[in-house]
Amino acid sequence: MHQAQSDLRRPLLILLAFLLTFPVSISATDERARERNAMVHEQIVARGIKDSTTLSAMRIVPRHLFVPVAQRPYAYQDRPLPIGYGQTISQPFMVAYMTELVSPGPGRKVLEIGTGSGYQAAILAASGAKVFTIEIIPQLAEAARERLDDLGYGGVAVRSADGFYGWAAEAPFDAIIVTAAAEFVPPPLIEQLAEGGLIVIPVGSPYFVQTLMLVQKRDGKPYSTSLMPVRFVPFTRATK
């Protein structure tokens, strides 16, 4: 009788051990998905972002995997977070806002200046765009390349270079997103923009509030519209 009870308990104990072990990761994954959905609903949709492609990408891409481990508890809060080397990952709303402005999608070719951790590039790729991204800090560029590849966004082309000069070999681009504040729009970026294309860029002093600008190329000339006050890290140039 004792042996029979023992035999019955054994599979139950094995099942209990399995349930105690594996749901931890599943539960954590579900919790992060809930956090992302809440982020989209409370921070992004509530502030007027409507593009379904952008919203879908924001729900899918795991922002917590694009920040240092110490910052992951705050990954789905509406604020920028430090990622090292004096750089930050933009707040979720700003990423969604800039993404919606350029309307990424299949067939669209988008250049990003300022890869950082790769989050904005992942959002653009998840929206269906063909993405090229430039990061001036080699360590960030390499880490972003590996991270994007590990998360299934290996199609994103990452390059370490001075973003001021764009990526002439891959031009023209349908859209260019700049994630650092420049004192003016770099002329090479305008040159590399397709006719009718858009540049989204924060313009102004790196020490004060800047203005997010939307630049459209029409008849070969740039036409700018001021959108909102913003604060971005400075546009870093290569030292001579």
Where are the model-predicted features located?
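Generic structural marker for isolated residues within well-ordered, non-membrane alpha-helices
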Residues: 13, 40, 186
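Class I SAM-dependent transferase core
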Residues: 26-111, 119-123, 127, 140-142, ...
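Short amphipathic alpha-helical segments with coiled-coil-like heptad repeat character
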Residues: 2, 66-68, 197
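Conserved nucleotide-cofactor-binding alpha/beta core module
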Residues: 103-223
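Bacterial N-terminal signal peptides that target proteins for export
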Residues: 2-14
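Bacterial N-terminal signal peptides
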Residues: 11-23
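Intrinsically disordered, low-complexity segments enriched in Ser/Pro/Gly/Ala and basic residues
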Residues: 5, 24-26
